């Protein structure tokens, strides 16, 4: 029986790079040969703290891209060689929220890398329910695999921009200059934000942030963020505040950063 390499979660603090059996493609499934898979913050948290949603042993990884290797006999609309990505939290398609079109709120979400083997492997099986419910997306030609693999986290930033109703002329504050904070920064600009304020405490991420497209970079170790935002907005406050740092104090501070009737997104997970 053929084997492949995979990063397998066995429990809290126990993640192994090991050989597993290459999965076979069922009639209603797709098998994808993975060529890029990102590491999400939730993967790190799972390793450090465990995760009750995980069903070990299981291959990790939900931010992936790859080429379809095998198409199940009953699958239509996909061909071998197509590059695909996924909305990897698979909805049931039947609950109250799914019927309303709010599949992200599905009461039976089964994510790749949690409920189904994920993309930190040479091959992954995309289950029939994911195909049926529209979770598989073809990638246009010319996009690099490592860029395509970021479609899932970028879609989260797009969701934040849409829920915060970012429009042309807005002043947007992003707190936290990690990968997701920077993605939110770029997406906010694409949605028309006129002024972008990026805040990060002193350290490596602050140094890296100096190369990104923001109008004001705030070192929160040395500067008072609330005072800076007030000064940059004529004392009014920001139209939108996106907190991409899982810290209670920063999340509480967001209220002081936003103007009256402003919009706040607690993008990062709670502490």
Question: Where do the model's predicted regions map?
Answer:
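Glycine-rich beta-strand-centered segment in the early N-terminal region that forms part
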Residues: 23-37, 51-96, 137-142
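Structural detector of well-ordered beta-strand residues that form the stable sheet scaffold
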Residues: 65, 85, 173, 197, ...
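NAD(P)H dinucleotide-binding glycine-rich loop of Rossmann-like/cofactor-binding domains
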Residues: 92-175
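Glycine-rich cofactor phosphate-binding loops and adjacent beta1-alpha1 units
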Residues: 164, 207, 212-271
